[in-house]
Amino acid sequence: RNMLSFARMPFQAIAQQQVKTGGYSAEYGRSLGGIVSIVTKSGSNDWHFGGSVEWEPEWGKASGKDVWERDPDAADPLYQYRSDNTSSSLIYSAYASGPIIKDRLFFFALAEGRDNQTDDYYSLNSRKTSDTTPQGFLKLDWYITDNNLLEFTGLYNKRKTKYHTYDYNLTADGENRYNVGRHEAPIEQYEIENGGKLGILKYTGYVTDNFTLSAQYGYLSNLIDSRLPANPPGSECPWAYSFGLTTSVVD
């Protein structure tokens, strides 16, 4: 339930979203100005099963609009080429929850799959992206006694997006072809990884009606735009452009 602000949660695993603007406990660290806390779903003595499907097919979307240059003599009259771009998204999940030991040990488990596809076409090249990475979530609640609770929260949300880039084939005269609208000559392919793993173990002891003891340990492994294979040395250098401008400067 805590420390999840650094990890993407499957939507169907969220029970509540809380906004705290003050008076929150030390488990939220030294944050200032308020926090957003996610409360995950948990199991109970009742069995529950369910699932969801979110589908955004390519044929259900309007085509993008091209943006044209005002200069009719421009080599590429299209400023932004969008009309052939396509995208589709499919996210599906299934969950189950219930008692492992009645009145004492409960679970909530969820698995989520996805199939997201995008085709982007530019003036001189194109790119295809796909994401089919599964994700999972597990919550265990163990009431050791009526006054002692042990909770485990586990999350796997690593996401791999595959990229394929292409050039448009040249004409018979070796000239560039613009706005072809299909993938032709492969250039490279690579993956971008985001997310990772999260594990939280929390103990809560209700000592008296006015005194509660809580202890928590968490582990988080999170990647941000990690590329495989890695970029070659020097790729982090900035781009440099040279324009044929006429100036009054004489070398």
Q: Where do the language-model regions lie?
A:
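Glycine-rich, phosphate-binding/catalytic loops in enzymes
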Residues: 34, 68, 233
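Transmembrane beta-strands of outer-membrane beta-barrel pores
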Residues: 23, 53-59, 102, 113-117, ...
